[in-house]
Regions:
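A glycine-rich beta-to-alpha transition motif near the start of alpha/beta enzyme domains, typified by
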Residues: 1-107, 146-263
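Short, solvent-exposed secondary-structure boundary/capping segments
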Residues: 109-116, 246
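Active-site glycine-rich loop that binds ribose-phosphate moieties when present
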Residues: 117-136, 158-160
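Glycine-rich beta-alpha junction loops
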Residues: 117-119, 141-145, 251
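Internal active-site segments that recognize and position negatively charged phosphoryl groups
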Residues: 128-155
């Protein structure tokens, strides 16, 4: 079995092409592949499959858990399909556990994905880490996000452990936590702790959650657009008048690996 390593703003993945849906993988095998010391090393694993004749992204976190959606991962998957000759450039759908997403993929350059409608789940949340507690926004991207705004991201600390988010019963399967600082140039600097992974260089669904939270925080009328600056590189997010998030950013494929020793 051949796996391909790729990333979107340094949020990295191992991809396997399985259009006939013959490949079954366990959580333990995903963990082995994604392990940065003994495996290939990545934030997540993507099985490129088909469902009802359309492309389907079977996404797993690095701990082997199943995730609904990954905004960086779906761009990297689209890049794979184009570069390996399985799909023509242009606009096409990819199905996910969070529903169908439509992507605009040029022959070269950044890839745009309509992430669908996002919404605030009302009710105050708090996030605590490094001895600090902030109130924040509960955002539903098909997967859960807690977004908090801080004066300085240095206050957040090392994020080696998951922040404590309350009320805990809002997130029975865990939550992605974004910490955001407004920069003088209008960009949003961000760090993220992803459930099932830890701190990552970027999170596509997280940047979309941050964009909506920023509009709420600043009482900005929609449509609105933001440049989000996670450690891995810049992403742009537009929130349209119907609260649909349109995410644009790069996707990179690097090299292929033989995965047989991990399976």
């Amino acid at each position: 079995m051949i796996g391909t390593y790729g990333h979107g703003t340094e949020n990295d993945f191992v991809l396997v092409f399985d259009p006939d849906n013959k490949f079954e993988i366990s959580a333990t095998q995903v963990q082995a592949i994604c392990d940065r010391k003994t495996g290939i090393g990545s934030d997540g694993f993507i099985r490129i499959a088909k469902q009802d004749g359309k492309w389907f992204m079977d996404y797993r976190n690095s701990d082997g858990s199943i995730a609904e959606m990954c905004g960086n991962g779906i761009r990297v998957m689209a890049k794979y399909l184009i570069e390996r000759g399985h799909q023509l450039p242009g606009i096409f759908p990819i199905n996910t556990r969070d529903g169908m997403k439509f992507l605009s993929v040029p022959e070269s350059g950044d890839i745009t994905v309509n992430m669908g409608q996002i919404r605030e789940v009302f009710g105050e949340i708090t996030a605590t880490t490094n001895g600090h507690t902030w109130t924040g926004y509960n955002i539903d991207m098909g997967n859960p996000h807690a977004v908090v705004f801080v004066e300085d991201l240095d206050q957040v600390g090392d994020l080696l452990t998951s922040p404590i988010v309350e009320p805990a019963d809002e997130y029975p399967d865990g939550v992605n936590v974004e910490f955001v600082q407004f920069l003088d140039n209008g960009e949003l600097k961000m760090r993220v702790h992803e459930r099932g992974v830890g701190e990552t260089k970027s999170c596509g669904t997280g940047t979309c959650a941050v964009a909506l939270a920023a509009a709420l925080f600043k009482s900005t009328r929609l449509p609105a657009s933001w440049i989000i600056n996670p450690p891995g590189g810049l992403l742009s997010v537009e929130i349209d008048a119907h609260s649909n998030a349109i995410l644009t950013g790069p996707a990179v494929l690097k090299e292929d690996f033989d995965l047989s020793k991990y399976l």
